[in-house]
Curated annotation (Swiss-Prot):
GO terms for cellular component: plasma membrane. The lineage of its organism: Bacteria, Pseudomonadati, Thermodesulfobacteriota, Desulfovibrionia, Desulfovibrionales. It comes from Oleidesulfovibrio alaskensis (strain ATCC BAA-1058 / DSM 17464 / G20). InterPro entries: Membr_insert_effic_factor_YidD. This is Putative membrane protein insertion efficiency factor. PANTHER family: MEMBRANE PROTEIN INSERTION EFFICIENCY FACTOR-RELATED (PTHR33383:SF1). The keyword Cell inner membrane applies. Its main location: membrane. It is a peripheral membrane protein.
Length: 86
């Protein structure tokens, strides 16, 4: 999937970050926030896998989870690049 389609797919997330999120006090238990994680996951992994990662993250963002630093995992493609460049 092209990067342009991924950017279009994250427009609702950007809308949420800009217009809806500021109306509420910060409550995300993770760094980066769930919305930032979702946007990065979709850009890095595509709409389907990134959306799945974002959904898993949002479901974990609750009082039963400690939270903390939880970055988006690197894609296999990025891992392969790193191995080949060594």
């Amino acid at each position: 999937m092209t990067i342009e389609l991924r950017k279009i797919a994250i427009l609702p997330i950007r809308f949420y970050q800009r217009f809806i999120s500021p109306l509420f006090p910060p409550s995300c238990r993770f760094v980066p926030t769930c919305s930032a994680y979702a946007a990065e996951a979709v850009l890095r992994h595509g709409i389907i896998k990134g959306g799945f990662l974002a959904l898993r993250r949002i479901l974990r963002c609750n009082p039963l989870c400690a939270g903390g630093y939880d970055p988006v995992p690197e894609s296999r493609h990025q891992d392969a690049k790193r191995v080949r460049s060594c």
